[in-house]
Amino acid sequence: MSKYTSDSSNFGADGPFFRIIREGLEGLADGEDYFDLLADDVVVEYVISVPGYPRRVDGRQGVIDLYSGYDDYMTVHTADNLRVYRDPEASVAVLEYEVHGESVLTGRPYNNRFASIITVKDRKVTHWRDYLDPIAVFDASGWPKRSSLR
């Protein structure tokens, strides 16, 4: 088992999301799983997101709480197309990547693209600013229902 989650979860040591983030932050941050990469006082901002999702989460435990039920809604099978841009003087990395999976609730495919601006201090992520494609989330979740568009 990873430090904060099971190895097989989307965020665990064997999860494709963690593997691509670990690859993008190689040499900058260390951790046994996604949550272990985060500093205790990390700030995570969701600049482009979906309705009902928080715009900001403070602290590692807050991020763990936010994602505690994620595996019940979405399964990520693969993550790819990683592009990494770094400013070593500022300890900042910009990661562009894609995730592919399916909605657990609808069985619909989930294919999303992300851009994450990540600040690292003392080998832990201290700030994470995330941009995602909300339409991909809507498509996977079946929202809005087609009948409501008539």
Task: Describe the function of each predicted region.
Residues 15, 61-64, 112:
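Short, well-ordered alpha-helical segments
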Residues 32-91:
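A solvent-exposed, acidic/Ser-Thr-rich amphipathic alpha-helical stretch
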Residues 1-40, 146-150:
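Short, low-complexity N-terminal intrinsically disordered segments enriched in polar/charged residues
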Residues 2-13, 69-150:
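A beta-strand edge to alpha-helix "cap/lid" segment located at domain peripheries
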Residues 21, 42, 47, 63, ...:
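Hydrophobic aliphatic residue packing
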